[in-house]
Each structure stands twice: as structure tokens, then as C-alpha cells.
Amino acid sequence: MKKIDILSIGNITQDINIVGKKKYYSLGGTSFYAYKVSEKLGFDLGIISEVSNKIDYEKYIDIKKLIFQKTENHTIFENNYVSGLRYQKVINKPGKILVNNLSNSLASIIPKIVFYCPILNEIENKFFNLFDKSFKVCNLQGFVR
């Protein structure tokens, strides 16, 4: 069993940011940002997310920290910034992240904290019954979006 500080459950997204006539591509999603902050603060964080072969995640994340469910099309948001306002739309919606698809990996980790942070309600409810000894927190945005 591997002990980790934080397990973040929610999809990493690809964000297309349009400012004027320029497009900028980046990763996003609460799981990704939690990873970046945890890394800076020295915490060991694992991420559960859907991933596709269309993004080279290794450029941005220590791939050993990623517990993934394969998908054809990852979650994509387009953010168009006009006159200081953001107009957001979903280009690719996520599928459900399913416990049964990850059960071997889930059985081998013991997180101190589980951070439920979906983007568009993609976390299967069975995840809430796992990790009995962990402190659990939620980012509600992705549950109500």
C-alpha cells in the first residue's frame, strides 16, 4: 500500500483560451491545479482522471502520479475573453470516471485526504464509499455545473 497526502478525483481538462485573435492551449481543471499547488508545497498528490492519447500529459505532470481511465476524447473547454468577460463552452464533455475501471489501482493507495473535484459531474457516486480512513473534501462547482 502506498500512502499519499492527497488524492484528487476529477478530470484534467484541455483549455483553449481565446484572447483577441490568438488561441492559447493549456491544461486545466481543479485536479490539475491541485497537483501544481501540492507540488510547490511539497505534498504528494495523486490524480484520478480520464485521459486520451491526444495530450502528452508527461510534459505537465509526473505520470506516476496519474491514475487514469482511458478515453477517446478528453474534456475540452473553450474560454473566449472579450472586453474583460469570459464566455465559456464545453467542446468535449467528460465520460463518467468509474470505480470498476480503476479498482486495482485504488486498492493500492491510502490517501490522507481525498479531494473530490469534478469538472462536469463525472465522478461515479461509488467513489464516496471508498477511503474510509481519509479526510474528504469537495469542490462543489463541478457537481452543480
How would you describe each model-predicted region?
Residues 3, 14-25, 40-117, 121-122, ...:
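Conserved N-terminal subdomain of the carbohydrate kinase-like
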Residues 29-40:
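Histidine-anchored nucleotide/phosphate-binding helix
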Residues 9, 139:
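Conserved N-terminal Rossmann-fold NAD(P)-binding element of oxidoreductases
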Residues 10-12, 30:
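Active-site metal-binding loops of divalent metal-dependent hydrolases
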Residues 30-31, 71-72, 140-143:
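Short, acidic/turn-prone active-site loops that include or flank metal/cofactor-
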